[in-house]
Amino acid sequence: MKEILQQRRHRLSRLIQSGVAIIPTAPEKIRNKDAHYPYRADSYFHYLTGFNEPEAIVVISGLEGGRSILFCREKNEEREIWDGFRFGPEAAKSEFGFDEAYSIESIDQILPELLGDIDQIFTPVGTGDSWDSRIFNWLNTTRQRTREGINAPDRLVDVRSILDEMRLIKDSVEQDTMREAASISSQAHILAMRMTQPGKFEYEIEAELLYHFKKNGSQYPAYTSIVAGGKNACVLHYIENNSVLNDGELLLIDAGCELDGYASDITRTFPINGKFTGAQKELYDLVLDAQLAAIDQTRPGNSWDAPHEAAVRVLAQGFIDLKLCHGSLDQVLETRDYFKFYMHRTGHWLGKDVHDVGNYKINGGWRQLAPGMVLTVEPGCYIRESEEIPKEFWNIGIRIEDDALVTETGCEIITADTPKSVNDIEALMAA
């Protein structure tokens, strides 16, 4: 892994040419009073360093062969007794392959020296007043040396636009990690299906998911799990997870683990009592057909929008057939009448963040999919109670979501272990 991290830093150094990149990790965050949230490193910082401790900054030079420097906390026996192991600069330098490493306490003295006679600084710009102030302070310190013939950089460039494009294409190590995260999450969804029955609470199902994530090496859930029974599934980001599960209703679970800094993201919808009703099956099969059409369009050379357009066409025609929308397919698409039942996009990038980085459009047009990209494919339909809607469809929310790795010839569904056909779901729940 050290070699992969070094390769990423060297690639960034080539892209910034005669500049210097300065990238901080995330700060620790207080939950309340003396209780902290579990610490997670900043995704950009971790992508380049693999380093998980707070109070750290990486500096990468576009000159001198891509020199990389880590600033981190010193070893401290007393703090390690209370808070746990620290690498310290020397061990971190060796473990993660940096050219140099220093105490974070010395950065105000060392960093201005590194900014002399370079063209520009690459850093996350506008992420917060405190970080911007630190950058300006280092810059001003360098400017004070102009009488010595040392020039300060005169441009600030947001490094995230460069790193976004690097992170968009996953290397083989990232792909393998994401496959493993997907496998853990798939098994968690299977266990959740097996334990679901009327009378249980949503939070009981959530607990099973979180238990399986942690038991299998996941450090955190990738996001707050959605466990939404019945009408709760019509709330796209429902996270209360505190309602009882009712016989005859569906349960929508949107949950995935994070493993070694990489997210998985799966949604399945299934009957609480193990058997779809006729109306539930009609809508479910429609959403599944839309997802399969979108997956078929998830291939290199196709536009980012191609899977979404394919899903929308299938859903719109299905809504017409079920008398939920009225008019021709072209009319429903033009007026976006389908939008009242399907109001979100069909996917997003996936990686170190669950809604991962990378532009969806380039120069005003949808970008083309390419091997190594990972995205979700997640059409759905959400039908609230309304006198205009047949009663058998009221309060049904369905979403089916898989994670797709674009390959040379199409895509690999890395979450395929999770059952999603009506027959497979009913068979699993009956076992």
Per-segment meaning from a language model:
Residues 1-431:
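Active-site neighborhoods and metal-handling regions in enzymes and metal-associated proteins
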